[in-house]
Amino acid sequence: MENVVIIDAVRTPMGRSKGGAFRHVRAEDLSAHLMRAVISRNPGLNAAEIDDIYWGCVQQTLEQGFNIARNASLLAEIPHSVPAVTVNRLCGSSMQALHDGARAIMVGDAKISLIGGVEHMGHVPMNHGVDFHPGMGRTVAKAAGMMGLTAEMLAKIHNISRQSQDEFAFRSHQRAYAATQAGHFAKEIVATNGHDAEGVLKRFDFDEVIRPETNLSGLAALRPAFDPVNGTVTAGTSSALSDGASAMLIMSESRAKSLGLTPRARIRSMAVVGCDPSIMGYGPVPASQLALKRAGLELADIGLFELNEAFAAQSLACLKGLGLLESMDDKVNLNGGAIALGHPLGCSGARISTTLLNLMERRDVQFGLATMCIGLGQGIATVFERL
């Protein structure tokens, strides 16, 4: 079986969904911009040799409909002979795109895949047009379709206090802002056109979503967002609504060598699991355990972790389940997470993988693990080995 290596990994800045930088920029344009960037950054690559494009997107309607992967590739002027498919595993969509592209290479059906994902949550809200089957309530709790209430459930089951959630959210903003100030995101962000508050066209090279002014007293003053009577989960301890795209260039190790391209990491293992929809946020625990088993590694072998950070309660429950609470500040989401950066659904899997790869290089770490919870009860994980 072919080894799959990561050649490049980039993303757009994360823009606020409500009146943010990308309010006048379409999802296809964000995607096409990154596709072009990946190709231009790797002059040894002939775009016509890409075997397939796998692009994650959850709300596949309006501007994100009718196979946005293909629409974006046409806008990017990638040769018409290169096919493209849009992938949907909800929050894990672009990580699933990575898995799909990698698997095609592993079995010999492809040599080069361009993968990534996008979500413009400002233009296409996450609940747009959603119509759950009324009979679902016979097999699944109705609240399982409300992500905030599943986070409340995890908080209750795992005794995650309101204070610890506020502290985790504060940490996310602090770390993301510190990473921005130190230039740690510069290697992964591709400057992208947007519009400032006055509507003036501007080139953005920073994440608009981070709130450096966040403090514990402000977080403590927020009301529960999902369970107004007994809840502990607030808007401040939930991932921000944002717009963005991410992309990765992957290929077989042999093709990278023949093209003279330097691999940054290899995919050591991949895993996806199901779990109870009522505690969908716990999916990263069994997914990570399965990925580690397939990689032949132990938790202690992993130097860095990236968790999608849908909610502080969800993240803390997973860290508790994996036994990572004590080492969190040394190993987990060191540049902050989705509470500060936002969680554009179809973009997030490749985004956290991109951030992880850069952290692994900066800290000289051999193994890293990226993992995500997925709405309605799934988890996905990928183990990377730095080269």
From Swiss-Prot:
Catalytic residues, per the record, are: 91, 343, 373
Read off the Pfam families from this record: Thiolase_C, Thiolase_N
Alphabetically, the GO molecular function entries are: acetyl-CoA C-acyltransferase activity
SUPFAM superfamilies in the record = Thiolase-like
* Root EC class: transferase
Gene3D superfamilies the UniProt entry points to: 3.40.47.10
Give the pathway listed in the UniProt entry for this protein.
Answer: Lipid metabolism; fatty acid beta-oxidation
User: What Enzyme Commission number(s) apply to this enzyme?
Assistant: 2.3.1.16
Places the protein is found: Cytoplasm
Q: Which InterPro entries match?
A: FadA, Thiolase, Thiolase-like, Thiolase-like_sf_Thiolase, Thiolase_acyl_enz_int_AS, Thiolase_AS, Thiolase_C, Thiolase_CS
Q: What domain of life is recorded for the organism? A: Bacteria
Q: What is its main location?
A: cytoplasm
Alphabetized, the UniProt keywords read: Acyltransferase, Cytoplasm, Fatty acid metabolism, Lipid degradation, Lipid metabolism, Transferase
Q: Which GO terms describe its cellular component?
A: cytoplasm
Q: Which reaction does it catalyse?
A: an acyl-CoA + acetyl-CoA = a 3-oxoacyl-CoA + CoA
User: What are its GO biological-process terms?
Assistant: fatty acid beta-oxidation; phenylacetate catabolic process
Give the protein's function.
Catalyzes the final step of fatty acid oxidation in which acetyl-CoA is released and the CoA ester of a fatty acid two carbons shorter is formed. Involved in the aerobic and anaerobic degradation of long-chain fatty acids.
Quaternary state and interactors: Heterotetramer of two alpha chains (FadB) and two beta chains (FadA).
Family according to the record: Belongs to the thiolase-like superfamily. Thiolase family.
PANTHER family referenced in this protein's UniProt entry, alphabetically? 3-KETOACYL-COA THIOLASE FADA, 3-KETOACYL-COA THIOLASE, PEROXISOMAL
Which protein is depicted? 3-ketoacyl-CoA thiolase
